[in-house]
A protein has these predicted regions:
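Membrane-interfacial terminal anchoring regions of lipid-handling membrane enzymes
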Residues: 1-66, 70-74, 80-83, 91-425
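The substrate-binding groove and active-site-proximal loops of carbohydrate-active enzymes
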Residues: 88
């Protein structure tokens, strides 16, 4: 890793963060362990995470923060940039060894996205199970972050035992990881820290970034245009980003299975890529840890007015909806949910919601209706609204959905919040 380039790029990221009008609110920073090796698992909705999240996390932890990024991004100037900020390609043959080594030594924290790729439609639950939708199809969340954390702690505990019982094998292991001093390895613990990022509002429109890109290249792909319109608007128009840290998972507590403990203490030579006797037990532990951090990540979604309006509109069974009825239902929903304090809410929902029933002085209903009409989810602008049900249920092109039907995305985002869904129904 080029540390000079990392620091220089960090200055550029700081400037970009200042330039952006995004407002970032941090919640739960007390959940970040002050000591230990940290692996952050984060939901992935925009390129903003790839560009700015390492800088934000570095400012909170004072640690270099490296990340695992899709191999397709490592091309041209973007690839150089990603190298400089500590990103590692998913196809790097040494990626696992690099991650485990740096977690053993604590030289860097890591960011991994368990969905594997950006989830533009925010569809991550199907029939009560986590199932990620993407342009390439559907797949369960990856267990890679859990597996890497388990392998890190496996070797940490193994070194701790072998330095006393089989020092030659311990020294061989340290040499394999290119670690000169094992003392720093033994005193650390490995933690997975779940992180949720919620963006509000989600709006896509032409902006300075998309205009500039068109002037440079008038043959942009639809995918790039969509990303510039959606994420450029977020950065330049002032999106609220709630960054919420969940309870850290101490990985050492997940290695107590007798078969795993036997492998940890084995005096036989175990190379990094060797299959071990307890691999099935390790795999089961990885799946369990993945379920824990997925529950934590998506349980921390910060609910906002768009979530309530979109969810209520989707669940109302009638095609024709009176606007006053919709406002009353959302007012009661907000009052019930916030008072019971079962999930997290945007700061605008912490205040009195009476304006929804009176003059809509903060424009929450008006802004939602404008978006619904522009994207043809709703027709009519007076007392009776005509709902286009297909716009809230039918699938859309993965790389166009944030432009063509953001309300579908918004309602998908809160599907994992069972308490909210019960209140909506």
């Amino acid at each position: 890793m080029n540390r000079f380039a990392y620091r220089t790029t960090g200055l550029a990221l700081k400037a970009l963060s200042w330039f952006s009008k995004a407002h970032v609110t941090i919640h739960g920073r007390e959940n970040i362990p002050r000591e230990g090796s940290l692996l952050f698992v984060v939901n992935h909705f925009t390129r903003i995470e790839t560009l700015l999240l390492p800088y934000w996390l570095n400012s909170l932890t004072n640690l270099p923060v490296w990340s695992l990024a899709d191999y397709e991004l490592f091309k041209g100037a973007l690839g150089t940039y990603l190298d400089n900020v500590g990103a590692v390609s998913t196809r790097n043959p040494d990626r696992d060894r690099l991650i485990v080594r740096s977690l053993l030594t604590g030289e860097a924290a890591w960011v991994i996205y368990p969905e594997g790729r950006m989830v533009k439609n925010k569809k991550i639950v199907e029939k009560g199970r986590y199932m990620i939708s993407s342009a390439g199809g559907k797949h369960p969340p990856h267990t890679g972050a859990a597996t890497l954390a388990l392998r890190t702690e496996f070797y940490r505990q193994r070194l701790h035992r072998l330095l006393k019982e089989a020092p030659l094998e311990a020294r061989r292991l340290l040499s394999e990881f290119k670690i000169e001093d094992g003392a720093g390895v033994l005193t650390r613990n490995t933690f997975i820290v779940p992180v949720n990022l919620t963006y509000y509002p989600i709006r896509a429109k032409e902006n300075a970034l998309s205009d500039l890109a068109r002037k440079i290249n008038d043959n942009l792909s639809d995918r790039l245009v969509e990303e510039l319109m959606t994420e450029g608007t977020m950065l330049l128009s002032g999106v609220d980003i709630d960054m919420r840290f969940g309870r850290a998972i101490r990985i050492g507590e997940c290695l107590t299975c007798p078969k795993i403990e036997h492998d940890i203490g084995s005096r036989q030579v175990i190379n990094f890529d060797d299959s071990i006797a307890s691999r099935n037990q390790m795999r089961r532990e990885a799946i369990g840890i993945m379920q824990r951090y997925m529950d934590e990540i998506y349980g921390m979604t910060t609910v906002n007015h768009d979530h309530l309006f979109a969810s209520m509109l989707r669940h109302i069974p009638y095609k024709n909806v009176r606007s006053d009825d919709l406002k009353r239902k959302v007012y009661l929903l907000a009052d019930q949910c916030v008072s019971m304090n079962q999930t997290h809410y945007h700061r605008s929902l912490q205040e009195s919601q009476l304006p929804l029933l009176t003059d809509d002085r903060f424009g929450k209903f008006r802004e939602f209706m404008t978006l619904a009409q522009q994207t043809e989810v709703i027709a009519g602008a007076d007392e009776t609204l005509v709902k286009n049900r297909s716009r809230l249920t039918n699938p859309f092109d993965f790389h166009r959905i944030r432009i063509d039907n953001p309300l579908h995305v918004i309602s998908n985002e809160v599907e994992p919040l069972e308490f909210l869904q019960r209140c909506v129904r």
